[in-house]
Amino acid sequence: MSASISTQPAYDVAVIGGGLLGAAVAYGLAGLGLKTLMVDEGDIAHRAARGNTSLVWVQGKGHGCPAYTAWTVRAAEAWPVFAAELNELTGVDANYRRTGGLKFCLGDTEFESRHRLIDSIETESPAARSEMLDRQALLDIYSEIGPQVTGASYNPMDGQVNSLLLWRALHQGFQQHNGQYLPRHSVGSIRQIGNAFELVAGNETVWAEKVLLAAGIANARLAAQVGLNGGVRPVRGQVLVSEKLQSRFAVPATDLVQTDAGGLLIGNVEEDAGLDESTNIRVLSGMARRAVATFPSLESVQLVRSWAALRVMTEDGNPLYQRSESHPGAFAASTHSGVTLAPLHATVLARWIAGLEMDPAVEAFRPEQRHVH
């Protein structure tokens, strides 16, 4: 790709960021027939997807923000068709399964606290469909739970997917829709000149009519250049991986998810650690102890890997979708739910950025609307 010497935009939209959020929107934009460029730092980027357990998750989301609950429910309902579409186009099966999902509670205090949260969300948003299961009901699903387990919350819309295969399918689908991919480039500056945005990424300069910031933590650095508020901070997640298990954990939980390969992913921590991606033995030990308390049989299981990754968190934990008033054509998107919301990012959000549909659901997550939540 050669540097441009003209302000004539070579692309309809340039998407900065090639993680799950950026790739989903870019896939959708290219599918709409827009000439789309995805600029991606590549493996040096802080990939948020490395720090999650690949859940498509409804329960517990949107407390105090019914719009987020409704958005999440809508995404979960869209997942079966979305997964089938990606598979048909790319041949990549992301292994999406709607299994229902659990959040285990250890002790009465955890159960009562979770019960209050679920009741509050259900009062605000009955469509969320979460419920509490006492210990006896939970034993019908998992007879092997430990004596400390007092119950769990459950939602039938929850499920799981292989997020790495999802990422691969989105990138492959994007390029099959004639999208252009520029890897191993970090955007340093953005300027609006006339009817176009100039993006300088290393030794490359590209021009686009519109630009979407979907760069995760880097949005905080880039947003001010186009009159937007970064509004994000890094949150560290840590993951433990077990050896492949013969036994099957058919219903995933927030902190215990079995992959399609058989290994068990353990982890559901959120830490404010700046840009530190190192693991912490104290935290990992706590995660392992909780897993054994939940399923005592795991005590003899060998752990084979651990890692940490930085996830993206907005100021209030809800998605943030922005459209610049001072730089028309500039947009930004941030969320820590890139897996769950992928179907809507590829459709509704892409159409919003393309100017084809002003969906009220998207407008609800603009900064100007925060006060109504």
Residue ranges and their predicted role:
Residues H46, E204-F249:
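Central helical "cap/lid" subdomain
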Residues S153-G202, V206-E209:
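Helical element adjacent to the flavin cofactor pocket in flavoenzyme catalytic cores
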Residues S297, V301-H373:
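C-terminal catalytic lobe of FAD-dependent flavoproteins
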